[in-house]
């Protein structure tokens, strides 16, 4: 029936309109909090893995040494990490990152209990990025020294020492592997923090 149309008794009819009600507001799915909890637990587990990698790398590098006897009496060749400042920087940086990861464990536990925390997670993500940069810089510098120890440099007339100091080179190489593995874990930690913050934005 159109507006203004007259009905049988001669009176105009009034237009009728259908009311449109907005759809009811549905609560957010419970799966969101479950995903945040999984991300927080993964963050905590990865921190333990990174602690093991950095601690193992620092200990392996700081305790490595090898002495070669020489034909002449009282003459020995000894190789230690402290002979090279780059390797000393590697040990210090790995120790600092390991200490930071240990101190960050309480905050990670809080995120498991309260997955919705934002400010502490943002601070942790920033510090994780700083520690990642420090660990990557020290490991990259140490990797250059380890490469020279294995291959030497023909242009600089440097000879490799790993044919003589086999045990020393094996330990510092294993230390680098653990350090780069910890760096990969830190990348994963930064990604998890960014993902959690993006979900809460």
Swiss-Prot record:
Protein keywords: Cell membrane, Cell wall biogenesis/degradation, Membrane, Transmembrane, Transmembrane helix
Compositionally biased intervals (Acidic residues): 1-11
Topology of this chain in the membrane: Multi-pass membrane protein
Major localisation: membrane
GO terms under cellular component: plasma membrane
A Pfam family the protein falls into: CASP_dom
Record-annotated disulphide pairs: none
Domain of life from the UniProt record: Eukaryota
Compartments, as annotated in UniProt: Cell membrane
Residue ranges, annotated region (Disordered): 1-26
Topological domains, Extracellular: 56-86, 150-171
InterPro entries: CASP/CASPL, CASP_dom, CASPL
Topological domains annotated Cytoplasmic: 1-34, 108-128, 193-201
Membrane-spanning parts: 35-55, 87-107, 129-149, 172-192
GO-annotated biological processes: cell wall organization
Assigned protein family: Belongs to the Casparian strip membrane proteins (CASP) family.
Function: Regulates membrane-cell wall junctions and localized cell wall deposition. Required for establishment of the Casparian strip membrane domain (CSD) and the subsequent formation of Casparian strips, a cell wall modification of the root endodermis that determines an apoplastic barrier between the intraorganismal apoplasm and the extraorganismal apoplasm and prevents lateral diffusion.
UniProt-listed PANTHER family: CASP-LIKE PROTEIN, CASP-LIKE PROTEIN 1U1
Assembly, per entry: Homodimer and heterodimers.
Protein name: Casparian strip membrane protein 5
Species this protein is from: Oryza sativa subsp. indica (Rice)
């Amino acid at each position: 029936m159109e507006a203004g149309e007259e009905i049988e008794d001669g009176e105009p009819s009034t237009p009728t309109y259908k009311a449109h009600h907005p759809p009811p507001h549905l609560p957010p799915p419970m799966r969101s909090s479950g995903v945040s909890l999984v991300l927080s637990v993964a963050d905590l587990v990865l921190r333990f893995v990174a602690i093991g990698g950095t601690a193992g790398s620092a200990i392996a590098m700081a305790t490595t040494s090898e002495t070669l006897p020489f034909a002449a009496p009282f003459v020995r060749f000894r190789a230690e990490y402290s002979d090279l400042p780059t390797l000393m920087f590697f040990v210090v940086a790995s120790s600092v990152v390991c200490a930071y990861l240990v101190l960050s464990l309480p905050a990670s536990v809080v995120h498991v209990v309260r997955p919705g925390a934002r400010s502490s997670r943002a601070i942790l993500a920033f510090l994780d990025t700083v520690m990642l940069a420090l660990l990557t810089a020290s490991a990259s510098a140490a990797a250059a020294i380890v490469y020279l120890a294995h291959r030497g440099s023909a242009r600089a007339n440097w000879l490799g020492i790993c044919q003589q100091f086999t045990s020393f080179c094996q330990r510092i190489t294993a230390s680098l592997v653990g350090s780069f593995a910890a760096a990969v874990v830190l990348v994963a930690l930064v990604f998890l923090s960014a993902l959690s913050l993006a979900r809460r934005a």
